[in-house]
Amino acid sequence: MLSFSRVVNCSRTCSRFLGLSLGTASLCAAGANIALLFPNWDVTYLMRGLIGKHAMLGSGLWGGGLMVLLAATLISMTGSFSKSAPCLQVLIALLSSGLALLGAVICFVTSGVALKDGPFCMFDVSSFNQTQAWKFGYPFKDLHNRNYLYDRSLWTSVCLEPSKAVVWHVAFFSILLCISLLQLLLVAIHLVNSILGLFCSFCEKH
């Protein structure tokens, strides 16, 4: 009886820690997505509508951010429902896990696609008469013979504006990718912790 009680208490403490960790990760994801809206901390690109679709989608704000933050709040409150019915505890665990899982997956997929397509920037488009023309777009999206992620020479030679567009894009979307992976790991731990805690609660009552 004592061992089951200790496991249950440990599970509740772990839930609070997981909730705090997920909440912190969600705020970091939101911060990274906000940074992507202001290349080089310049607001003019956002005002002119020259921000890439992946950053404008805001998956780090509402997916890895708000959805995970709501789930983290539910997870942290798990200890408050310690005397409630097991069915309610199961419902809260499933709801919080599903919400965090969905938000993290959305952020992960969007970040992966963004890294694959490359940054939205101004680049040189050579016409048939060899005159120079510039436009905003995704210069690396259809570059099949070279991968810009591994070819650092392309980082400074292709995108003309914003300056260091590739570095900014790769850095913050990589951060979002890592944060979403961490969130997925924390959700998996939360599921295991919830199942263990509920099992021990049943054993403790019987």
Curated annotation (Swiss-Prot):
GO biological process: positive regulation of osteoclast differentiation
GO molecular function per UniProt: protein homodimerization activity
Residue ranges that the UniProt entry lists as topological domain Extracellular: 38-54, 111-171
Keyword Membrane: yes
A Pfam family that the UniProt record links to this protein: L6_membrane
Effect of a null allele: Knockout mice are born at the Mendelian rate and show no overt phenotype. Animals exhibit higher bone mass compared to that of wild-type animals of the same age, because of impaired osteoclast differentiation (multinucleation). When fed a normal chow diet, knockout mice show normal body weight, fat tissue mass, adipocyte size, or body composition. The knockout does not affect energy expenditure, food intake, physical activity, nor fecal lipid excretion. When fed on high fat-diet, knockout animals show reduced weight gain compared to wild-type littermates.
Residue ranges annotated as Cytoplasmic topological domain: 1-16, 76-89, 193-206
Compartment(s) of residence: Lysosome membrane; Cytoplasm, Cytoskeleton; Cell projection, Filopodium
Glycosylation sites noted in the Swiss-Prot or TrEMBL record: N129
A single cellular component GO annotation: lysosomal membrane
Tissue-level expression: Predominantly expressed in osteoclasts (at protein level). Also expressed in white adipose tissue, as well as in bone marrow-derived macrophages.
Transmembrane segments: 17-37, 55-75, 90-110, 172-192
InterPro entries: L6_membrane
Main location: membrane
Induction remark: Up-regulated in gonadal white adipose tissue after high-fat diet. Up-regulated by oxidized LDL in RAW 264.7 cells, a macrophage cell line (at protein level).
Organism superkingdom: Eukaryota
Family: Belongs to the L6 tetraspanin family.
Subunit structure: May form homodimers and homooligomers. Interacts with integrins ITGAV and ITGB3. Interacts with components of members of the V0 complex of vacuolar(H+)-ATPase (V-ATPase), including ATP6V0B and ATP6V0D2; this interaction inhibits V1-V0 complex assembly.
PANTHER family registered for this protein in UniProt: TRANSMEMBRANE 4 L6 FAMILY MEMBER 1-RELATED, TRANSMEMBRANE 4 L6 FAMILY MEMBER 19
Role description: Negatively regulates vacuolar (H+)-ATPase (V-ATPase) activity by interacting with members of V-ATPase V0 complex and hence inhibiting V1-V0 assembly. Required for multinucleation during osteoclast differentiation.
Protein name: Transmembrane 4 L6 family member 19
Organism encoding this protein: Mus musculus (Mouse)
